[in-house]
């Protein structure tokens, strides 16, 4: 059998992966074996965090709405607001309520006063 | 998109809140809880845990801190220097005598802040004084002689809405004005 070199097969595969990790810091964008591992880790992170993102933002909106609602009246809270929202079947979601809280706080107060029965 | 709304210097500017224990009858823990919320910035609609968006709090007359029950003489503060046998305790009354009410308040607030890298920075924004005098009078903003506190850290705090309503910037409805009852 004549000797056969592998040629450029492996190099082409590794270049693609290297391009993916081209903006990583330090050895993670320079060393081939490290690059392969870091690409796997980063894809796992992005897969997991796509679902975490939805959870995290909802938590942030709830905190922000709570902050503004508690500033208005002594014994009012986010939980009571949501209860009244559901009782009156108002379809505003937390994302929109949080944006209203930032941009137009009085509008949120008006809404909460209206639905407060 | 909610991360980019209201990214203005004015929104993130730190405001100074003033609180006097001489006029506030609430006990130590309840006030400390309210102070911790303000140091974290959780009273703001732009709150984000990754940024330190907290405010300054000036607490005066800390010698008059009110505690219920016999806590003043029975509550013990422990210190340990990691050397075996060096557990020391001090009652709250002795803490008042040795370090002052400011330290008692700071210990209370410190336990109520999230235990992360921002805790000491936030605690440093709490300025405590035993008497009524403090060097930050110019930092506390006043409109028409009323302190602009947009929240309830003071006992019967005038809200920003009440102040703005005085200046006819809000419609004269019940919108947003603090109701003393309920």
UniProtKB/Swiss-Prot annotation, chain A:
Keywords annotated in UniProt: Chloroplast, Plastid, Ribonucleoprotein, Ribosomal protein, RNA-binding, rRNA-binding
UniProt cross-references to Pfam families, sorted A to Z: Ribosomal_L20
GO cellular component: chloroplast; ribonucleoprotein complex; ribosome
CDD domains (alphabetical): Ribosomal_L20 (cd07026)
SUPFAM superfamilies cross-referenced by the UniProt entry: Ribosomal protein L20 (SSF74731)
Any Gene Ontology biological process: ribosomal large subunit assembly
An example Gene Ontology molecular-function term: structural constituent of ribosome
Compartment list: Plastid, Chloroplast
Family the UniProt entry places it in: Belongs to the bacterial ribosomal protein bL20 family.
Task of the protein: Binds directly to 23S ribosomal RNA and is necessary for the in vitro assembly process of the 50S ribosomal subunit. It is not involved in the protein synthesizing functions of that subunit.
Name of the protein this chain belongs to: Large ribosomal subunit protein bL20c
Organism: Eucalyptus globulus subsp. globulus (Tasmanian blue gum)
Name of the coding gene: rpl20
């Amino acid at each position: 059998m004549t000797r056969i070199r592998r040629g450029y097969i492996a190099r082409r595969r590794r270049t693609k992966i290297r391009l993916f990790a081209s903006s990583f810091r330090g050895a993670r964008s320079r060393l081939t074996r490290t690059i392969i591992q870091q690409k796997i880790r980063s894809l796992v992170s992005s897969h997991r965090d796509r679902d975490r993102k939805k959870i995290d933002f909802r938590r942030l909106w709830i905190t922000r709405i709570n902050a503004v609602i508690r500033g208005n009246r002594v014994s009012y809270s986010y939980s009571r607001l949501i209860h009244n929202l559901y009782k009156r079947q108002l379809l505003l979601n937390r994302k929109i309520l949080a944006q209203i809280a930032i941009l137009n706080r009085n509008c949120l107060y008006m809404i909460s006063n209206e639905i407060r029965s | 998109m909610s991360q980019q709304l209201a990214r203005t210097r004015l929104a993130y500017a730190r405001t100074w809140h003033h609180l006097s224990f001489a006029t506030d009858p609430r006990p130590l823990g309840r006030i400390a809880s309210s102070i911790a919320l303000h140091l974290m910035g959780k009273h703001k609609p732009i709150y984000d845990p990754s940024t330190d968006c907290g405010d300054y709090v000036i607490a005066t007359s800390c010698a008059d801190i009110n505690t219920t029950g016999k806590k003043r003489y029975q509550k013990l503060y422990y210190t340990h220097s990691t050397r075996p046998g060096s557990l020391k305790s001090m009652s709250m009354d002795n803490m008042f005598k040795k370090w002052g009410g400011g330290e008692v308040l700071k210990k209370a607030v410190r336990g109520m802040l999230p235990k992360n890298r921002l805790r000491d920075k936030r605690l440093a924004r709490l300025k405590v004084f035993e008497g009524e005098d403090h060097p930050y009078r110019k930092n506390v903003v006043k409109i028409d002689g009323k302190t602009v506190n947009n929240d309830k850290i003071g006992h019967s705090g005038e809200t920003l809405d009440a102040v703005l309503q005085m200046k006819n910037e809000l419609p004269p409805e019940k919108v947003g004005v603090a109701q003393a009852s309920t």
